[in-house]
Amino acid sequence: MVGKNNSNHLPPGFRFHPTDEELIMYYLRNQATSKPCPSSIIPEVDVYKFDPWELPEKTEFGEKEWYFFTPRDRKYPNGVRPNRAAVSGYWKATGTDKGIYSGTKYVGIKKALVFYKGKPPKGIKTDWIMHEYRLSESRTQPTRPNGSMRLDDWVLCRIYKKKNLERAIEMMKVEEDTQEPQIMSVTNPIHEVVASNGQQTLKLPRTCSLSHLLEMDYFGSISQLFDDNNSYNTISQNNTLMTNVNGYVMPHQAMEKFQLGEVSQISMNPSYQFQ
Protein backbone atom coordinates (compact mmCIF):
# COMPACT_ATOMS: atom_id res chain seq x y z
CA MET A 1 0.00 0.00 0.00
CA VAL A 2 1.20 3.50 -0.71
CA GLY A 3 2.61 5.27 2.29
CA LYS A 4 2.04 8.89 3.19
CA ASN A 5 5.67 9.69 2.46
CA ASN A 6 5.22 8.70 -1.18
CA SER A 7 2.13 10.92 -1.51
CA ASN A 8 3.77 13.88 0.16
CA HIS A 9 6.78 13.75 -2.17
CA LEU A 10 4.71 14.10 -5.32
CA PRO A 11 5.40 17.38 -7.13
CA PRO A 12 2.89 20.24 -6.68
CA GLY A 13 0.04 20.11 -9.16
CA PHE A 14 0.65 16.44 -9.92
CA ARG A 15 -2.34 14.66 -11.48
CA PHE A 16 -2.41 10.95 -12.24
CA HIS A 17 -4.29 10.59 -15.53
CA PRO A 18 -2.59 7.72 -17.37
CA THR A 19 -3.86 6.39 -20.67
CA ASP A 20 -4.96 2.78 -21.04
CA GLU A 21 -1.72 1.99 -22.85
CA GLU A 22 0.39 3.56 -20.08
CA LEU A 23 -1.45 1.60 -17.40
CA ILE A 24 -0.66 -1.64 -19.22
CA MET A 25 2.91 -0.94 -20.40
CA TYR A 26 4.36 0.93 -17.41
CA TYR A 27 2.34 -0.21 -14.42
CA LEU A 28 0.56 -3.55 -14.79
CA ARG A 29 3.35 -5.17 -16.83
CA ASN A 30 5.94 -4.04 -14.29
CA GLN A 31 3.83 -5.24 -11.39
CA ALA A 32 3.30 -8.65 -12.99
CA THR A 33 7.01 -9.11 -13.74
CA SER A 34 8.23 -7.83 -10.34
CA LYS A 35 9.74 -4.67 -11.78
CA PRO A 36 9.42 -1.25 -10.13
CA CYS A 37 6.71 1.05 -11.43
CA PRO A 38 7.47 4.65 -12.50
CA SER A 39 5.75 5.86 -9.32
CA SER A 40 4.60 3.92 -6.26
CA ILE A 41 1.14 5.41 -6.10
CA ILE A 42 -0.91 2.30 -6.92
CA PRO A 43 -1.30 0.05 -3.85
CA GLU A 44 -1.81 -3.72 -3.75
CA VAL A 45 -5.34 -4.29 -2.45
CA ASP A 46 -7.70 -7.22 -2.94
CA VAL A 47 -10.68 -5.13 -4.04
CA TYR A 48 -13.05 -8.10 -3.75
CA LYS A 49 -12.57 -8.23 0.03
CA PHE A 50 -14.16 -4.80 0.38
CA ASP A 51 -17.22 -2.94 -0.78
CA PRO A 52 -16.36 -0.21 -3.30
CA TRP A 53 -17.17 2.67 -0.92
CA GLU A 54 -14.52 1.30 1.48
CA LEU A 55 -11.74 1.34 -1.10
CA PRO A 56 -10.92 5.10 -1.22
CA GLU A 57 -9.51 4.90 2.31
CA LYS A 58 -7.22 2.05 1.26
CA THR A 59 -5.05 4.37 -0.81
CA GLU A 60 -3.33 7.67 -0.13
CA PHE A 61 -3.86 8.99 -3.63
CA GLY A 62 -7.00 9.87 -5.56
CA GLU A 63 -10.06 12.06 -5.06
CA LYS A 64 -12.63 11.04 -7.69
CA GLU A 65 -11.07 7.79 -8.94
CA TRP A 66 -8.78 5.22 -7.36
CA TYR A 67 -6.30 2.69 -8.79
CA PHE A 68 -5.36 -0.69 -7.30
CA PHE A 69 -3.29 -3.74 -8.14
CA THR A 70 -5.37 -6.73 -7.14
CA PRO A 71 -4.91 -10.51 -7.43
CA ARG A 72 -7.34 -12.07 -9.84
CA ASP A 73 -9.34 -14.46 -7.71
CA ARG A 74 -10.73 -17.46 -9.57
CA LYS A 75 -14.08 -19.05 -8.90
CA TYR A 76 -12.58 -22.55 -9.14
CA PRO A 77 -8.94 -23.44 -8.33
CA ASN A 78 -8.15 -24.90 -11.75
CA GLY A 79 -10.57 -22.77 -13.75
CA VAL A 80 -10.27 -19.48 -15.55
CA ARG A 81 -13.58 -17.95 -14.51
CA PRO A 82 -12.99 -15.05 -12.09
CA ASN A 83 -14.75 -14.75 -8.76
CA ARG A 84 -16.27 -11.26 -8.57
CA ALA A 85 -18.18 -11.56 -5.30
CA ALA A 86 -17.58 -8.81 -2.74
CA VAL A 87 -18.68 -8.27 0.87
CA SER A 88 -22.27 -7.08 0.37
CA GLY A 89 -22.67 -7.56 -3.37
CA TYR A 90 -20.90 -8.46 -6.58
CA TRP A 91 -19.29 -6.94 -9.65
CA LYS A 92 -21.03 -7.65 -12.94
CA ALA A 93 -19.39 -7.23 -16.34
CA THR A 94 -21.11 -4.87 -18.75
CA GLY A 95 -20.52 -4.21 -22.42
CA THR A 96 -17.76 -5.83 -24.44
CA ASP A 97 -14.06 -6.05 -23.69
CA LYS A 98 -11.84 -3.41 -25.27
CA GLY A 99 -8.47 -4.31 -26.72
CA ILE A 100 -5.51 -2.10 -25.76
CA TYR A 101 -2.69 -1.55 -28.22
CA SER A 102 0.83 -0.15 -28.05
CA GLY A 103 1.32 0.97 -31.60
CA THR A 104 0.10 -2.04 -33.56
CA LYS A 105 0.87 -4.57 -30.82
CA TYR A 106 -2.00 -6.02 -28.82
CA VAL A 107 -0.94 -5.69 -25.17
CA GLY A 108 -4.00 -5.83 -22.93
CA ILE A 109 -7.73 -5.96 -22.32
CA LYS A 110 -10.02 -3.50 -20.58
CA LYS A 111 -13.28 -4.71 -19.05
CA ALA A 112 -16.03 -2.55 -17.52
CA LEU A 113 -17.96 -3.75 -14.47
CA VAL A 114 -20.79 -2.37 -12.32
CA PHE A 115 -21.29 -3.10 -8.62
CA TYR A 116 -24.62 -4.60 -7.51
CA LYS A 117 -25.72 -4.81 -3.87
CA GLY A 118 -27.24 -8.11 -2.80
CA LYS A 119 -27.04 -11.54 -4.34
CA PRO A 120 -27.33 -12.40 -8.03
CA PRO A 121 -29.46 -12.30 -10.01
CA LYS A 122 -31.58 -9.89 -7.93
CA GLY A 123 -28.91 -7.42 -6.94
CA ILE A 124 -29.53 -3.68 -6.94
CA LYS A 125 -27.41 -1.70 -9.37
CA THR A 126 -25.24 1.08 -7.90
CA ASP A 127 -23.21 3.97 -9.35
CA TRP A 128 -19.87 2.30 -8.61
CA ILE A 129 -17.88 1.44 -11.75
CA MET A 130 -14.71 -0.61 -12.20
CA HIS A 131 -12.39 -0.72 -15.19
CA GLU A 132 -10.33 -3.89 -14.97
CA TYR A 133 -7.08 -4.01 -16.96
CA ARG A 134 -5.31 -7.30 -17.64
CA LEU A 135 -2.37 -8.34 -19.81
CA SER A 136 -2.89 -10.20 -23.03
CA GLU A 137 0.14 -12.49 -22.58
CA SER A 138 0.08 -15.65 -20.49
CA ARG A 139 3.75 -16.45 -19.95
CA THR A 140 5.04 -17.52 -16.54
CA GLN A 141 5.89 -14.79 -14.06
CA PRO A 142 9.12 -14.98 -12.05
CA THR A 143 8.67 -16.50 -8.60
CA ARG A 144 7.83 -14.02 -5.86
CA PRO A 145 8.69 -14.43 -2.17
CA ASN A 146 5.06 -15.17 -1.31
CA GLY A 147 4.70 -17.86 -3.98
CA SER A 148 4.42 -18.27 -7.71
CA MET A 149 1.75 -16.43 -9.68
CA ARG A 150 0.85 -16.46 -13.34
CA LEU A 151 1.21 -13.27 -15.34
CA ASP A 152 -2.55 -12.77 -15.69
CA ASP A 153 -3.13 -13.33 -11.96
CA TRP A 154 -2.51 -9.60 -11.46
CA VAL A 155 -5.02 -7.06 -12.71
CA LEU A 156 -5.12 -3.29 -12.38
CA CYS A 157 -8.45 -1.79 -11.29
CA ARG A 158 -9.66 1.77 -11.74
CA ILE A 159 -12.67 2.41 -9.52
CA TYR A 160 -14.90 5.47 -9.39
CA LYS A 161 -18.44 6.50 -8.61
CA LYS A 162 -20.30 7.54 -11.73
CA LYS A 163 -22.17 10.53 -10.25
CA ASN A 164 -19.04 11.89 -8.57
CA LEU A 165 -17.11 11.90 -11.83
CA GLU A 166 -20.00 13.45 -13.76
CA ARG A 167 -20.40 16.12 -11.08
CA ALA A 168 -16.69 16.96 -11.25
CA ILE A 169 -16.87 17.33 -15.01
CA GLU A 170 -19.99 19.49 -14.68
CA MET A 171 -18.29 21.76 -12.13
CA MET A 172 -15.35 22.21 -14.50
CA LYS A 173 -17.75 23.27 -17.23
CA VAL A 174 -19.49 25.72 -14.85
CA GLU A 175 -16.15 27.29 -13.91
CA GLU A 176 -15.27 27.69 -17.59
CA ASP A 177 -18.65 29.28 -18.30
CA THR A 178 -18.30 31.80 -15.45
CA GLN A 179 -14.97 32.97 -16.86
CA GLU A 180 -16.53 33.89 -20.20
CA PRO A 181 -17.95 37.42 -20.60
CA GLN A 182 -21.69 37.55 -20.16
CA ILE A 183 -23.72 39.43 -22.77
CA MET A 184 -27.28 40.42 -21.98
CA SER A 185 -29.70 40.95 -24.82
CA VAL A 186 -32.99 42.79 -24.81
CA THR A 187 -35.78 41.30 -26.85
CA ASN A 188 -39.26 42.51 -27.58
CA PRO A 189 -38.78 46.00 -26.10
CA ILE A 190 -42.36 46.93 -26.96
CA HIS A 191 -45.14 44.93 -25.36
CA GLU A 192 -48.79 44.71 -26.29
CA VAL A 193 -51.26 45.76 -23.63
CA VAL A 194 -54.93 44.90 -23.81
CA ALA A 195 -57.13 47.84 -22.78
CA SER A 196 -60.39 47.46 -20.87
CA ASN A 197 -62.33 47.63 -24.14
CA GLY A 198 -60.41 44.66 -25.55
CA GLN A 199 -58.33 46.73 -27.96
CA GLN A 200 -54.56 46.31 -28.03
CA THR A 201 -52.14 49.19 -27.65
CA LEU A 202 -48.36 49.23 -27.45
CA LYS A 203 -46.52 49.81 -24.20
CA LEU A 204 -42.90 50.87 -23.85
CA PRO A 205 -40.57 49.01 -21.46
CA ARG A 206 -40.18 50.39 -17.94
CA THR A 207 -36.46 51.03 -18.24
CA CYS A 208 -34.47 51.98 -21.25
CA SER A 209 -30.97 53.32 -21.73
CA LEU A 210 -30.14 56.20 -24.06
CA SER A 211 -28.18 53.84 -26.31
CA HIS A 212 -31.22 51.61 -26.44
CA LEU A 213 -33.37 54.55 -27.57
CA LEU A 214 -30.90 55.47 -30.27
CA GLU A 215 -30.83 51.89 -31.57
CA MET A 216 -34.60 51.35 -31.70
CA ASP A 217 -35.66 51.27 -35.30
CA TYR A 218 -39.24 51.98 -34.45
CA PHE A 219 -38.39 55.35 -32.88
CA GLY A 220 -36.58 56.67 -35.94
CA SER A 221 -34.13 59.51 -35.32
CA ILE A 222 -34.20 61.79 -32.28
CA SER A 223 -35.10 64.72 -34.53
CA GLN A 224 -38.18 62.83 -35.67
CA LEU A 225 -39.31 62.45 -32.07
CA PHE A 226 -39.59 66.23 -31.69
CA ASP A 227 -40.80 66.98 -35.23
CA ASP A 228 -44.36 68.29 -34.94
CA ASN A 229 -45.04 67.49 -38.58
CA ASN A 230 -44.65 63.71 -38.35
CA SER A 231 -44.74 62.87 -34.66
CA TYR A 232 -48.05 64.20 -33.37
CA ASN A 233 -51.26 62.64 -34.51
CA THR A 234 -53.64 62.99 -31.61
CA ILE A 235 -56.51 60.55 -31.50
CA SER A 236 -59.23 60.14 -28.95
CA GLN A 237 -60.26 56.63 -27.98
CA ASN A 238 -62.01 55.88 -24.69
CA ASN A 239 -61.17 59.41 -23.45
CA THR A 240 -57.44 58.66 -23.74
CA LEU A 241 -55.10 60.79 -25.81
CA MET A 242 -52.74 58.64 -27.88
CA THR A 243 -49.63 59.76 -29.80
CA ASN A 244 -48.47 58.14 -33.02
CA VAL A 245 -44.68 57.90 -33.30
CA ASN A 246 -43.58 56.55 -36.64
CA GLY A 247 -46.60 54.31 -36.82
CA TYR A 248 -46.50 53.12 -33.17
CA VAL A 249 -49.09 54.27 -30.69
CA MET A 250 -48.35 55.18 -27.08
CA PRO A 251 -50.14 57.26 -24.41
CA HIS A 252 -49.87 61.01 -24.93
CA GLN A 253 -48.96 61.49 -21.24
CA ALA A 254 -45.95 59.20 -21.62
CA MET A 255 -44.80 61.01 -24.74
CA GLU A 256 -45.26 64.38 -23.07
CA LYS A 257 -43.28 63.20 -20.06
CA PHE A 258 -40.50 61.99 -22.31
CA GLN A 259 -40.43 65.20 -24.37
CA LEU A 260 -40.81 67.83 -21.66
CA GLY A 261 -39.94 66.45 -18.26
CA GLU A 262 -37.29 63.81 -18.63
CA VAL A 263 -35.12 64.89 -21.57
CA SER A 264 -32.39 66.31 -19.36
CA GLN A 265 -32.33 63.13 -17.27
CA ILE A 266 -31.53 60.96 -20.25
CA SER A 267 -28.10 62.49 -20.62
CA MET A 268 -27.47 62.27 -16.87
CA ASN A 269 -28.86 58.82 -16.09
CA PRO A 270 -28.33 55.84 -18.41
CA SER A 271 -31.45 54.17 -17.07
CA TYR A 272 -34.76 55.94 -17.83
CA GLN A 273 -38.21 55.02 -16.59
CA PHE A 274 -41.23 55.90 -18.68
CA GLN A 275 -43.74 54.84 -16.01
Swiss-Prot record:
**As annotated in Swiss-Prot or TrEMBL, what is the tissue specificity of this protein?**
Expressed in roots, stem, flowers, and leaves.
Where is the protein found, in the record's own terms? Nucleus
Its GO biological process annotations read: abscisic acid homeostasis; abscisic acid-activated signaling pathway; leaf senescence; regulation of DNA-templated transcription; regulation of reproductive fruiting body development; response to abscisic acid; response to absence of light
Where it mainly occurs, coarsely classed, is: nucleus
List the molecular function annotations (GO) for this entry: sequence-specific DNA binding
Kindly indicate where the leader peptide sits in this chain. none
What's one GO-annotated cellular component? Answer: nucleus
Which Pfam families does its entry note? Answer: NAM (PF02365)
Pinpoint the NAC domain residues: 10-162
| TM ranges | none
Keywords on record? Abscisic acid signaling pathway, Activator, DNA-binding, Nucleus, Transcription, Transcription regulation
- Look up the domain of life of the source: Eukaryota
InterPro entries hit by this protein: NAC-dom (IPR003441), NAC_dom_sf (IPR036093)
Question: Per the entry, what induces it?
Answer: Accumulates during age-dependent and dark-induced leaf senescence. Induced by abscisic acid (ABA).
Which residue ranges carry the DNA-binding annotation? 107-168
Gene inactivation phenotype reads: Delayed leaf senescence (including delayed leaf yellowing phenotype under darkness or after ABA treatment) but enhanced fruit yield and sugar content, likely due to prolonged leaf photosynthesis in aging plants; these phenotypes are increased in plants lacking both NAP1 and NAP2.
Function in brief: Transcription factor that binds DNA motifs 5'-CGT[AG](5N)NACG[ACT][AC][AT][ACG][ACT]-3' and 5'-CACG[ACT][AC][AT][AGT][CT]-3' in target genes promoters. Promotes leaf senescence (developmental, light-induced and ABA-induced senescence) and regulates fruit yield and sugar content, probably by establishing abscisic acid (ABA) homeostasis. Activates the expression of senescence and ABA associated genes including NCED1, ABCG40, CYP707A2, SAG113, SGR1 and PAO, by directly binding to their promoters.
Q: What's noted about domains in the record?
A: The NAC domain includes a DNA binding domain and a dimerization domain.
Record-given protein name: NAC domain-containing protein 2
Q: Which species is the source of this protein? A: Solanum lycopersicum
Gene giving rise to this polypeptide:
NAP2
